[in-house]
Amino acid sequence: MIDKDMNSACMRGGSVRTLNNYQQVMEPRSPHTAWQFGVSQIVKREPMDEDKNDSGVTSGSDFHSSSPSSDTSQDLQHSYQSPQTQPARFYSTPIVPHFAYNHNPLTPPNSEPLVSPKSEKEEKDMETTLTPCASPNRKPDDNQDHLRRLEMSLEKSGLFSSKTSEHSVDELSGKSDNDAEEYDEQSLRVPKVNSHGKIKTFKCKQCDFVAITKLEQWNHSKVHIREDKRLTCPKCPFITEYKHHLEYHLRNHAGSKPFQCNKCDYTCVNKSMLNSHMKSHSNVYRYSCRDCSYATKYCHSLKIHLRRYGHTPNVVLDEEGNPCPDIIIDVHGTRRGPKIKTQPKAEEAKPETLPFLNLQQQLPFPGYPFFGGFPNAQLLQQLIRERQLAVGGSQEESRVLDLSKPGCSYTGEQKSRRKGPAFKVDPTQVESEEEDEETSTTVFSNVEVVQEEAKKEESDSNNNNNKEEGNSCQYCNIAFGDAVLYTIHMGYHGFHNPFTCNMCGVECSDKVSFFLHIARVSHS
């Protein structure tokens, strides 16, 4: 409530002015904008008592009267000037409310008081008078507590060894930030979390040891590396037995990364890392699983998938997406990357082993266009070559001797053959008379015709027997005129189930579906 004495006086800018000479435009004494009334001053902070309300105005029994007449008193003049003569402190003696809040009679009593911004000098004075309990810097303690909680959680889960826990967090946090070597050592002692939110582990390639920090991994490596072959880093506890590994590690310390990607800003220390990075710019997934739809760009990821689920790898693709049958995936091997398949020697390859070789290379066959191809072109060509040599030798043995040539002689095998049923040869006539020589030539030509016809009948009968016995598939009831085609066809039949494809593992119900499968599906 405004007192009756306020009829002729009002508060403006902390001083009393009469309303007789009221001006329309009232300029505040403050150098700030027009909406900020009252001189700038430091607002004191006081503890909230039970007898105080939310507005900050206390009862008249505790403090001086809040009437305008009391504002002109000497005590209030002194209390108003006290913030300028004495430094402001926390929990100091209370002041008059309307001086503290720059009370303006033109504003409602219950409204929020407007406080003008503080000048640079006043802010500096306030900073000097603040007690240390205002906002202490607890960042090192927070980091230290965080590391302690991480150690305790790791020790409870059994992932943190006792050797690592001996190096306390106090030891790590007490190191200087200017010392790069100590900072690196601190980062090596603290476990890291991967992108999946799990603690990153380091597995030993020679035993079952698993470490959660680089420092533990390097200390364990001393067990597998002899002392005369150990190569250590002069700046950190890194240890290896390979010179190029130490060279790459020292490049990381020096910040030297000579290999740079031509498509982005990526840089690395060796060519292998750059090749692995370049796969991220490619859309070809070279490695895939045969048993499911899993595909990846990295060979190591496929090996992990195959070991985890027991699946088999599919054909590896090259950088352009074409199949590479010479590249195989060694699932349980320790060597990084795929392996190049070694080709068997020609003399070691046998026709009997052809159906059981699980090879992917194909060779088109012009006689049977419905076949996508036949496995192992090298062995197939070798088999055809050997068969041609065998057929050529038998043709030379069965060739009829030309008796008109004087240098030829009979062999024991040729003497026992038939000479023809109704002809008799007199050698004396051949040597004495020219006419008889022509007659004998005609006679022997007849003998040659008889022998060729007899041999043809024998070969036809033998071929028919082979078709019925040797070159006939008992599962599909198909007779093959060539041993090569028969061998290739039998290679598609499974060992336990004849209607299971030996190349891809597809099970068919009967011989018709099996024949259609091997005829239509390209086994690449």
UniProtKB/Swiss-Prot annotation:
InterPro entries assigned to the protein according to its UniProt record, in alphabetical order: Zinc_finger/UBP_domain, Znf_C2H2_sf, Znf_C2H2_type
Biased composition (Polar residues): 76-86
Region annotation Disordered: where it falls in the sequence: 42-86, 101-187, 402-442
Annotated Basic and acidic residues bias: 118-127, 138-154, 164-178
Biological processes per GO annotation: segmentation
Pfam families in the record: zf-C2H2
Places the protein is found: Nucleus
4Fe-4S recorded as keyword: no
Start-end of C2H2-type zinc fingers: 202-224, 231-253, 259-281, 298-311, 471-493, 499-523
PANTHER family linked: ZINC FINGER PROTEIN, ZINC FINGER PROTEIN 64
Functional note: Gap class segmentation protein that controls development of head structures.
Entry protein name: Protein hunchback
Lineage summary: Eukaryota, Metazoa, Ecdysozoa, Arthropoda, Hexapoda
